[in-house]
Amino acid sequence: MNNTDLLEKIIRHQQNKDPAYPFREHLLMQLCIRVNKKIQNSTSEFFGAYGINHSVYMVLAILSMEEQHCLSPSEISQKLQFTRTNITRITDFLEKAGYIKRTDSREDRRTKKISLTSEGMFFIQRLTLAQNTYLKELWSNLTCDECEMFEVISKKLLAHFSDI
């Protein structure tokens, strides 16, 4: 018996006690939780091989998208919806690694700007190439139609959760 069979058996047992029990809804929720955990673990392992985590990657990615590869910590925090404390921790790490540098803002001396260094640009480019292969492998057992359907359903659920 695999994990999903056991999961269904447990939920079916609850349904047998109460025929109105939302079997499918409970099963879908449990499957989403398990898929999410597997993806998070896999992603953590992938980024861990490069000495970073997903949050660090997101900061590098957002900086690499900017025309001047430069943002203030508060802009990064706002765009990624990360706390200022988390941004400080991440930028401290990235600065020690040589991937970013902090400079005084030209507009306001009280603030700093975070800029990607050439080493940081090289790192994010190398990481992006590896990520292309990783992501294709991660989703390789789904057809194109299944991927589209998963995307539509996921977006619909996320929008619904924003409303409740």
From Swiss-Prot:
Molecular function, one GO term? DNA binding
Record bears the keyword Protein biosynthesis: no
Which Pfam families does UniProt cross-reference here? Answer: MarR_2
CDD domains in the cross-refs = HTH_ARSR (cd00090)
Q: Which SUPFAM superfamilies did the record assign?
A: Winged helix' DNA-binding domain
Q: What is its main location?
A: cytoplasm
- Please give the InterPro entries that the UniProt record associates with this protein: ArsR-like_HTH (IPR011991), HTH_MarR-typ (IPR000835), Tscrpt_reg_MarR-type_CS (IPR023187), WH-like_DNA-bd_sf (IPR036388), WH_DNA-bd_sf (IPR036390)
Q: Where in the cell is it found?
A: Cytoplasm
Q: Which PANTHER family match?
A: TRANSCRIPTIONAL REGULATOR, MARR, TRANSCRIPTIONAL REPRESSOR OF EMRAB OPERON
Name of the protein in its database record: HTH-type transcriptional regulator PapX
Native organism is Escherichia coli
